[in-house]
Amino acid sequence: MKLSPSKYLPVLLGTLSLTIANPSADCKCFPGDDCWPSAAEWKALNTSVSGNLIKTVPLGAPCHDPMFKGDVCQSLRQQWQNATIHFASSSSVMAPFFANQSCDPFQPRIRPCELGNYVSYAIAAETTSDVQNAIAFARANHIRLVIRNTGHDYLGRSTGAGALGVWTHHLKNIEFVDWDDDTYTGNAVKLGAGVQGFEVLEAARSRGLVVVGGECPTVGIAGGYSQGGGHSALSTSFGLSVDNVLSWEVITAKGELLTVNKDENPDLFWALRGGGGGTFGVVISMTVKAHPGTITSGASLSFSTDTNSEEAFWAGIQVFQDTLEDMVDAGTMVIHIITNTSFLIAPLTAYNKTEAQVKVIMKPFISSLTSKHVDFDVTYKESKTYYDHYNEFLGPLPYGKIRVGFEQYGGRLIPRSVVPNFTETLRQVTNMGVTWVGVATDVGPFGTRATTSVHPAWRSTLVHALLSTPWDFTKPWHDMIKLQDLMTNVIMPKVEAVTPGSGAYVNEADFRQPNYQDVFWGDNYKDLLEVKEKWDPEHFFFVPKGVGSEIWSIAEDGRMCKSAL
């Protein structure tokens, strides 16, 4: 990754008009408006970013006339739920609602391929100056700016109609450093904004280290993942990703490159540690703690109604709920998936523990299942390194096996005190078609409201729950919207009713979450809004359901205008 000095390039300011000419000062300039930049202006921008401006052609274009290519289209259909084809694109998004069926491989060939909610252009940023030029151009022309790395995004924050995208995917620098200050002394790693989980896993392994990253290896580390919190299979051992952040390099709405840490710009440091991606600036790099590598053991366990009565199945779920807190407190992180017919631990992760220790940790759960006559399968595996454990249970690396684009979501942080009494609610929502993915961990010891801006409920949470209903590309759009309506209006209220005062993880939640300010950030929201007003008083940076996003509204065609507050 090349880092240039913090300055606007003369070629940009010398060739682009600073006159904002749009139909309304209350709306961003939109394609087709008189104020939309001319071809010459886009060409000048391209020159200023060394030819890295990309005019969006949707990924699904080969499935539609006049660009139809049958073999390419068939390949796209087969790969559409693989993250790899999307994160290699400057515009494609993985969440199907925000792709809006405007140009996907599953619509009829004769249906026109339209930009829809995709960005109009993107800059494949390779330098700090590329990002600064993108910001300057968007400000000068009063157009929407979107920040994007991989397209892993449930809430529509990395795309937008009529927008210029800053594509950080090529900022791939990884530099290991020694860190020494009054809060941490030890190994650290500086990650460019485009670095993905599988890349840092490999780099850390080569040095005998581990770095907190997501359970999906293709997710970027420094972007929305960490800025929103970032849970990990290592979270019970080291906290959320954001608890491990030591410093950021950030470009502000004014185009200034800042170092942001506990000593320099501490208010912005706090806001970036949980306030959500795309809101306070463009992160260029992030420096995080790197921890010693060691043995890591894992386990998977499953049972279902195929070999158990419904009564025995739900008795097994209750046993799990009763023993989960002790398993986590013994030093494990437990990913579990529950439907109304199946239960799966996938996996339990125990950093710095042997297989024998994992068996001891799980013994009360196993013994209770046996006493309840639940038929189950269990496997254990001790690995020499965390990388090997990850590859075994969350791989195969580098890209893993998590599919994308086939679900829509809701989310909730489930307090410790609630979990043992939660089985009936689980039964109700899974009987409504929900797949429940639980991330059981304890991040309480690693941060406070003073150090991070994630919802304070994280620190007393036992399970972050991600609830999903299916998305079927072959079904009518209105059928899928009905399922999202079910999530927003029926399913999530049931879960919220038994978790009063808690919240949701901002990165994995319902994109239509009511009262999102409180649900995503709790009492931190007021302070986050003050930081937003200080560093971005014009609210140049915007993401849906983000801090300060109330000031903007998005019309049905994607046009972004000031809200009538």
Swiss-Prot record:
Positions glycosylated per UniProt: 46, 82, 100, 340, 352, 421
Keywords: FAD, Flavoprotein, Glycoprotein, Oxidoreductase, Signal
Biological or metabolic pathway of the protein: Mycotoxin biosynthesis
Broadest EC class assigned to this enzyme: oxidoreductase
MF term (GO), any: FAD binding
Position of the signal peptide: 1-27
Function in brief: FAD-linked oxidoreductase; part of the gene cluster that mediates the biosynthesis of zearalenone (ZEA), a nonsteroid estrogen that is a contaminant of cereal grains and causes estrogenic disorders in humans and animals. The ZEA backbone is synthesized from a single acetyl-CoA molecule and eight malonyl-CoA molecules. The reducing polyketide synthase ZEA2 is proposed to synthesize a reduced hexaketide intermediate by using different combinations of its reductive domains during each round of condensation.
UniProt family annotation: Belongs to the oxygen-dependent FAD-linked oxidoreductase family.
Protein name: FAD-linked oxidoreductase ZEB1
